[in-house]
Curated annotation (Swiss-Prot):
Keywords: Ribonucleoprotein, Ribosomal protein. This is Large ribosomal subunit protein eL21. PROSITE patterns: RIBOSOMAL_L21E (PS01171). The gene is rpl21e. It comes from Haloquadratum walsbyi (strain DSM 16790 / HBSQ001). It holds the Pfam family Ribosomal_L21e.
Length: 96
């Protein structure tokens, strides 16, 4: 049987928490608000299924351009090309 080519292939390490971070993620992370123009780091929280972006962009840094429902629109540069991702706040971390 041929191997799958779905969007989650090769994510064993990307979508696994370290032992300290296992279990339920903090609820305040899921309701975090970000301002337009604020820089955020994209980091998938494996314990939250909804509002994820494609794992290819895990580890990127982008800029919040707006809101879409409960999620945020994030502008990133990928290979010299501007792209817009939509992700919920559970998968975003503010840049200090």
């Amino acid at each position: 049987m041929p191997s799958s080519n779905g969007p989650m292939t090769g994510t064993r390490d990307k979508l696994s928490n370290s032992p300290r971070e296992r279990g339920m993620s903090p609820p305040q992370r899921a309701i975090q608000e970000y301002d337009e123009g604020q820089k955020v780091h994209l980091r998938i929280d494996p314990s939250v299924r909804e509002g994820r972006f494609h794992p290819r962009f895990n580890g990127h840094t982008g800029e919040v351009t707006g809101k879409q429902g409960r999620a945020f629109k994030i502008k990133i540069i990928d290979g010299g090309k501007e792209k817009t991702l939509i992700a919920r706040p559970a998968h975003l971390r503010a840049q200090e």
